[in-house]
Amino acid sequence: MQVQDQMNHLNIKEQEEQEEQEDRRREVILGDCIEKMKEMPDNIADIIICDPPYNFNKDFGNKSDKQAFPVYLEWCNEWISQCIRLLKDHGSLYIYGFSEKLAFIRVKLYEMNINVKWLVWHYCNRTSPSSKFWQKSHESILLCYKKSPVFNKDDIREEYTEGYKKAAGRTRKETKGRFSKGEVKTLYNVHENGALPRDVIKIPCLSGSYGKNERVDHETQKPLELCTKLIKAAKNKEKNTLLLVPFVGSGSEIIAAYKENIDFIGFEINPEFVDMTNKRLEDTKSIIDKNDKNDNCVSIASENKKSHNKDI
C-alpha cells in the first residue's frame, strides 16, 4: 500500500510538473531575427546570446556571411538595436565574434550609451600546422548591459591553480605598483567553490577528440560548457529567466537553457538548423526524463528499505 501511495504521489507530481512546463515559453522559430524581434515588446529578455555570422564566407545556407564589410556592420547595427530594446535594465547581452570586427561594433555600442565588458573565450586545443602566421586561439565576447547586470559569481567560480592551493592560508605582502605602496599584508584565501571568474574563459572548442559526442553538422558550434557558463552568470534566480537567441545555429544555447530550466525563444533563418536544434532538444529531453525516472525509482527503493528496517 505504501509503495502504491508513493507511486500515486509521483504521478501527481509529474502531472503538475508537466502542466508547469506547458506554461513555459520555449520556442525555436523559423524566420529572420530582425523581423521577428520587431514583433516583441520592450524589456522582455533577461539574457540575450548572439552568435551571428562573422562575415568570413562560411556557408550557412544563405548569403548572410558574404557581405561587404560596411553592409555587414549596418546589418549588425539593426539586430543589435533590436536586442538592446528587448533587453531588461539589469539583463545581459552577449555578442560573439572575432576581435577585429567586434572592435567596430564596440564603437557603435558606445554611441548607443551601452556599457560593455570585453570577455575572451580562449581555446587551446585547435591548431593549424600549415599556418604561416600567428595562430588564432580565441574569440571575443562582448557583455553588454544598460545598468548593473545580474551576476552570479559563485555559480561560475573556477578551479584554483595548484600554486595558489599550496599557498592557501599564507600571508602575502602586497607588492609596490601603480595602485599600491606595498604596505598592506593579505592572506591567500581559498573559497570552497573556487576562484573568482576571470574575463578570460578557458574552455576547449569542439575540435579533435573534445566534445566528439556533442558535435553536430554546423561550422561554428559553441560548446555547451561555454553556453552554460554565460547563462549561469546572468540568470535571474528570483523568477523565471527568459533567454533570447537571435541566431540559433547549432542550438547549443537552446540546449543549455533547457538544462538550466529557463525559458527561451530562438530565431533561425535556416530551416535545416531549426530541425537540427529541435532534434537535439528532443534527445536532451529524453535523457533528462530517463534520468529523472531512474532517480525516482532509486528514491522509492531507498525509502522502502528504510521503512522495512524500521519495522524490523
Language model segments and positions:
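Positively charged, low-complexity nucleic-acid-binding target-recognition regions
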Residues: 1-23, 281-312
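Core catalytic lobe of class I
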Residues: 2-12, 16-267, 272-274
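Conserved SAM-binding loop
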Residues: 277-278
